[in-house]
Amino acid sequence: MGAAARSLPLAFCLLLLGTLLPRADACSCSPVHPQQAFCNADIVIRAKAVNKKEVDSGNDIYGNPIKRIQYEIKQIKMFKGPDQDIEFIYTAPAAAVCGVSLDIGGKKEYLIAGKAEGNGNMHITLCDFIVPWDTLSATQKKSLNHRYQMGCECKITRCPMIPCYISSPDECLWMDWVTEKNINGHQAKFFACIKRSDGSCAWYRGAAPPKQEFLDIEDP
């Protein structure tokens, strides 16, 4: 067998390996409950993107310019963040490096959670909670005003498979993936993990504020 023929199996194996291994530059995020996303974010707003452009954001260690996408936004409401309105949001230029793509033109409203930058602007990635406003449930919209904040001292633990358990009283077990094979299930859409008067945490469902009896250890 010639050298060229012997090299074919090796080339095929290398090609197959390249297709099976995850790309190093892919964006990978762990699922989080909307309440966790709210609590982890510096800024949470309802807004529209009206324009976008590519901008330079300094240089890397080799002197090459760092490109980012700048979205000019119209803020509708701030649920968490600084006193002044957010005017610009920045993100990476491609989804492979966790860049976010927003519809521009000011017609589509979003809930946008992200990190604050020192200049009063905001930075977002695909790992942040960014969804069209009209896809949120009524409970999620109401929870943004106060409910989620009530549970920021609680820990929401995602259950990837049965069995799964909580390890402390301040945890709520997030079961959507097990029960519905969907991280945007009933617990994500209709429940918040609320801290009660004894320091424990429990799931609470409903658009109305939690009753005092619930906070004083009523079974949810």
Curated annotation (Swiss-Prot):
Record SUPFAM superfamilies: TIMP-like
Superkingdom, taxonomy of origin: Eukaryota
Residues covered by region (Involved in metalloproteinase-binding): 27-30
InterPro entries linked: Netrin_domain (IPR001134), TIMP (IPR001820), TIMP-like_OB-fold (IPR008993), TIMP_C (IPR027465), TIMP_CS (IPR030490)
Signal peptide: 1-26
Primary location group: secreted
Maturation and modification: The activity of TIMP2 is dependent on the presence of disulfide bonds.
Record-annotated NTR domain positions: 27-152
Gene Ontology terms describing biological process: negative regulation of membrane protein ectodomain proteolysis; response to cytokine; response to hormone
Entry keyword set: Disulfide bond, Metal-binding, Metalloenzyme inhibitor, Metalloprotease inhibitor, Protease inhibitor, Secreted, Signal, Zinc
A Pfam family that the UniProt record links to this protein: TIMP
Location(s) in or outside the cell: Secreted
Cystine crosslinks: C27-C98, C29-C127, C39-C152, C154-C201, C159-C164, C172-C193
Binding site for Zn(2+): C27
Entry GO terms, CC: extracellular matrix; extracellular space
Residues the UniProt record annotates as site (Involved in metalloproteinase-binding): N64, A96, R158, W177
Entry's Gene Ontology molecular function annotations: metal ion binding; metalloendopeptidase inhibitor activity
Subunit structure: Interacts (via the C-terminal) with MMP2 (via the C-terminal PEX domain); the interaction inhibits the MMP2 activity.
Described purpose of this protein according to its UniProt entry: Complexes with metalloproteinases (such as collagenases) and irreversibly inactivates them by binding to their catalytic zinc cofactor.
Annotated family: Belongs to the protease inhibitor I35 (TIMP) family.
Protein name: Metalloproteinase inhibitor 2
The organism of origin for this protein: Bos taurus
Gene: TIMP2
